Every structure is written in C-alpha cells, then in structure tokens.
Amino acid sequence: MLIVALATVRTRWAAFAGTFAALALGVSVIAMMTLVLAAASGGNVHQRPERFAAVPSVIQADPNLQVRDRYGSADSVPLLAQPDVPASVIARLPGAIPDRSFYAQVQGVSAAQPALGHGWSSAAFAPYVLTSGHAPSSDNEIVVAGSATVGSRVPVVTAGGSRTYTIAGTVHPRTGEQPIFFTDVEAARLSPGVDALVTYDAATADRAAALPGVHLQVLTGADRHEADPGAVQDTTELTGLTTFLGVAALISAFVAVTVTATAFGLSVAQRRRDLALLRTIGATPKQVMRMVCADAALVGAGGSAAGCLLGLAGAPQLASWIVRQGLAPSWFRVHFTTGSVLALVVAFLAGVAVAVLSVLVAAVRAGTIRPTDALREAAVEPKRIGPFRLLGGLVALFCGVAALAAVALIFPSAATDQKTEAEIVILLIVGTALLSPFLLRLLTRPFGRGTAGMLLRASILTGARRAAAAIVPVLITAGLAASILGASDTANAAASAGEHQQAAGADFVVLPAGTPGLTAALVDRIHSISGVEATAVTDTNMLVFQPPITSLHLEAPIPIPFSAIGIDHLSAALNLKVTAGSLTGLDDQTIAVDSSWDKHVGDTMRLWQPDGTPVSLKVIAVVASSGLSGPSLIVDLHNAGAPMPARVYAKTDSGASAAALLAAVRSQHARVVPISGWSAAVSDQQAKQNQVGLELLLGIAIAYSAIGIASTFLMSTGGRRSELALLHMTGAIRRQIVWIVAAESLVLTLIGIVLSAVVSGLVLGALYVALTGEIGSVSIILPW
C-alpha cells in the first residue's frame, strides 16, 4: 500500500496541493512562535556586557528571594528590583570597589538611553575614556558622555531635585546608558546604596561567593551583563513576553491544527469513490487504512519540512516586530541554539502528527465499512454525523459554557485573564465546528424559499461535511477576532475606570515630563502651596506569601507579587473608600488592604518590598476594591521602594491655588493635567499597549485562517467538478453555475459569521456579568 500511496500522491498532486499548503503554513506559524518563545525563554544569555566589560568579576546581591515554601522545600522568587549589596558584605570585602547607579540627567537634554549617574571610579569598568577635560575633582564637578563644553555649568536633575554642576570633562559614549560621572563622595551622597562591587582579584570573588549568611551572585564572563543598567527590567520584559507568547502559541497552534485537520478531512471525503473502489476489488481494511495514513504522512512530512523553513525565515522578522512594538528589550533577537533545533523538531513532528491524526478517523471508517456500503456512501454522503463527532462537539460545548458560567458567577477575577479567555473561546469554537453539519440544517432554512433557494439549500445539505469544512475557517477567524478583541477592549475599559476611582477627588494630576518620576523637591513644593491638598503616589508591587484566595481556595506555596500604591500622606485628593479602620496613621510600620483580602484591622502581614527587604506590617484599614487593576495594597512611599513618585493628585480650593500649582510645576520637569484629561490619556495608552499585544496574538492566526478559507473553498469547488458538469449537461448555463457556487460560498460565509457571533455573544455576555459584579455597570466594546 505504500507504493499505492506514493503513486496516489504523484498522480493526484493537485488534489493534495491545498492540504500541503495549509499544513506548510500551519507548521510555519507553530515554528515561528516556538522559535521566538525559545529565544525569550533563554533570557539574556546572548547579550554582551556593557558597563562591566573591562572587569573580570562583578558581585551583586542575589536578584531572587530565597524562601522555603509551605512544604519546607527551598525555592526562589524573582525580585521586582535589584537589591543593594549589604553594608556587612562591603566591610568584609575591603578590596572590592563599590559601584552606584542612580537617576541623573542634564536638564533639558532628552535621554535616548537610561540616564544614570555613577561615581568616577566606575568609569574604568566599561571603560569610559576621557576625550576632553579632566576627572571631577570636587563635588560640584561632573563628567558627561558625548559632546559638551568643558567649563560650562549645567543643571542636573536627580531624585532629590535639581542642582547646578560644572562640566569638568567628557567621555566617549557607549551603548546601554547615558551616564553622568560625579566624584565618589557626591555619588554616595546622592545614592547611599551600593548596587554592585567590582573586583579584579579572583580570591576576593571566591571569598564573596563563600560568605555565609548572605545571598550573593558573582558574575563573570557573559553573565556580567546581568549587572548592566536595566538588566532586571529586561528580565521582567522577557518573562512577560514568555507568558504572552505562550498564549499566542496556544491560539496559533489551535488555528493551525484546526484548519489543517479540516483540510485533510475534506481531502479524504473527496476520495470516497477511490476508497470504495479499493474495498470493492478486495483491499482489506488494514490496507486501506495504511494507504490513507501513508498519503497523509507523505504530504505531512513535505508540508512540515516546508513549514519549518518558512518558520526559520519568519522568526527573526517576528522578533524584530516585537522589539519595534516595545514588547521586548532592544537587543532581543532569535539565536539558533539547541533550543531552536528542539523547537523545529517539535513543529515538524506536530505537523506530521496532525496530518495523520486528521485522516485517522476517516481512514478507520473507510477501512471497516462494507464494500456495498462504501459504494453507496461514495455516491451520496451520509446525512447523520458520526457518534464520536457528536459526542466531542457536545462535550466541548458543555465544557466551554460551564467555564463561562464559572467565570461569570464564581471567579469573576479570571474574566480579564487572556489565557482563560483563549481557552474558553477555543472550547466553544471546537464544539461549534464539530456540530456544524447538524447546525447547517437549522441555519439554512431561511435560504430554502423559491426554486433557486431550494436548490441552493439542497446542494449545501447534500455535502454537509464539505460545507462544514468551509465554515470552520470563517468561524475561527471571526470568532477569535470578535471574542478576544472584544473581551480585551471591554476589560481594559472597565479596569481603567476602576483604576481611576482613586483619583476621583482630585482636580489635577502632576505627571513627570521627560523624567522617570517626580523629584522630592517638587513634591515638597506642591505640598507647601496654600489651598492645595495633594498626595504623591507611586505604583509598585509587593511580594506576599499568602494571596487573598485562589480559584480553588488554596494558599499559594511561594510569595507572589500583588499590585500596590505607595502614598506620602492622606488628602482629599485621594479617593479611597475606607470600610474599616482609618488611613490616618499609615506609615512605614502599617498597611491598608482592599476588601478582597481576608484580613482585619489589627492583623499583621508578612511582606517583601520590591527589592526583597522583608517587612511585617500591621493592617490599619480595609478599603473597598477599586477595580480589576486597582491596587490591592496601600503602603507608604518608603515601603513602596520607589525613589521618585509617579504622580501627585492635587485638589485646589480656588482659581488662585490652581494658578499657584501651575507656577510651581513650571520648569520642574513635570506637567499639570486636568484629572479628566489624564484619565482619558492613560486609558488610551493602556488600550494601545494591549492592542499591540493582541495584534501579535491574532494577526498571524487570522491571516492564516483567511488563507485557510480560500484554500478550503477552492478544494470544495474542485471536488465538485462532476456535479457541476452534470448541471451543465442538464441545461444550466455557465453564469447560472457560477451563481450557484458563489451563492453557496456566500451563504456558508454568512453562517460562519452567525456562529461566530453566537460564540462571541456568549463570551462577552459572561464577561459583562463578571465585570458588573466586580465594579458595577460596564459597557461592552466591540472591536470595530
């Protein structure tokens, strides 16, 4: 039968062209996603060190929190900020050179790269070489990178405020940062914490690695990049990208597998006469099954190989697009490693497996059916759908609807999780696709009026499986787009509305302009304005051992991050509805939680600041939940771990105080925005960021589905040559035949859109119920 399979593929290559193209494109999608996912999972191993390129060893505090989980096993949790090197370690390593990195920027000069200040002794680590002038010799002198006039005086902005310095010299710029070098004494004043220690002595590095009671990492070789500015942020971005690509790969694989399986199933259905003839002339069931599976394996191997080559070519382009959209660090690239080879092998095997499994059920049926029944089914397609298809469709629909009900009524917080959305939509689409031959009888009734309509409906129902194969790509394309985009837009709008409830009492918000935050001097100036009540706010995350509750009412075994805001003090500008206790006494020893936590006033919570500093805080207040993306914890600015507040909410009592606020902020690297304008701007920015991600998530999948639609319709039409020829022989003219084919394609497309609208309606309806229960009235936003 292998010889027969080879001959079949060779002589009927045109019949297999559609399935080959569908499989090649499907495997290319899977290969691209897995290659980029493998590159993101590999972290920054391919990035060369920049700031510490000229030193052999860099000593840092461990960027992971070392804990024991609830089962007593050692575990580590990535920290949200790089911790400082403990003072005790510095004292025990006298030969190591301290390195400090902190925000510092020449006023009025935009920073294309991170603007950072260092002590002059750190310049040799890169190395930075003087191109003019001399090293800073007093605390009011600096050295800058690039072109500048030596001897000129410039204002420099740091977290504390602005101060004028004299440019003593310049150095040649390097990639990765825009540095300003101070004297070591001035750098220590501006940033007391030590970010890293540098040693040229191997013995000192070994001693640091063996120090008891502390968790340090000694970086050498390519690992020195982990100490570069922004390395923690790069790791965070790659972690988020890995999570996101996992969801994207899930959806892309689903689309590829479904469209490919549909194409292969249709190709087998179009060969019913061949298979019936083989059974009639004496071919055994096993021989027929082997032949069909061999056909699929041959086409699958060729299509998978072509798809892997396309994936190899497309993965670097996809990675470049991800970088341009700001979803990954600027240096992120696809490097071909052992992980890449494994990704290609997985994509290839997945393609062959999909091809064989897609025809397996049809092959079993074709092989086991009696010859006389095979001839009858070859002439007229059976009207009933198979029991396995019926059972699979019902189970998938039941699971999808049950999951929607659970999200809407029991776990509304899961409504905004993209992975949950994708899984539910996939279940509903799979169930609807499997039951589509049965649903066709109901949905084609409106088209059965009149002679032409009756002929059209009869043509569709006679080839119900063929028609269902044409519906599936339409269902996937429209269903995914409407469900996931609509759910995302709706959730973003609802979450944004909830987030801005905290600023409902403010008239204005002060935002940084060209700086990473607001300086302490500016915040103090705003607080000193008569008639202005203000609260400085920064967004952060705190690691907490015990989450409020999981979907199964279990405690998480390790600390996980929870959103929080840090505030400097309470004012009328901050709108937090207190349901128990009071926020008046909020300080560095206390905390407030929202109502989702099972905590009461007087309880003590064990937390970790973003840099891993452990704190035990007393709950002094419980506040109402402020929405799906609002903070669940409220702490003071010290515990927030951010040196510069992100914004200041300000409430003015008169036009004069508003004018004073504007005057105070002028020329202070900040801007004043009316609260309504700020809410809209932030909402638009959040929507844009989410939209970029969803374009990546759905763009490839929808494009592939569109190709699948064209391929399936071409295969369906090509398999009806004898039927169309019979119509022509009975008197139908060419225009009438074209009208019948076009009308049938249009009707099937409309049915696919209707089914996708039902799926989207179920998803968005459940989302509406979930969001209404969480934050009140919401509006469903459709993606058009």
Q: What are the roles of these predicted feature ranges?
A:
Residues 2-257, 266-269, 291, 501-502, ...:
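Membrane transport/envelope proteins' first extracytoplasmic loop
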Residues 3-6, 10-11, 15-16, 20, ...:
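Alpha-helical transmembrane segments
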Residues 8, 12-15, 256-300, 369, ...:
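Interfacial "coupling" helices/loops that link adjacent transmembrane helices in transporter permeases
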Residues 14-22, 240-243, 256, 342, ...:
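Alpha-helical transmembrane segments, especially those used as permease/efflux helices
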Residues 308-342, 405-420, 755-784:
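Short helix-loop junctions at transmembrane helix boundaries
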Residues 426, 435-595, 603-604:
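Juxtamembrane segments of multi-pass membrane proteins
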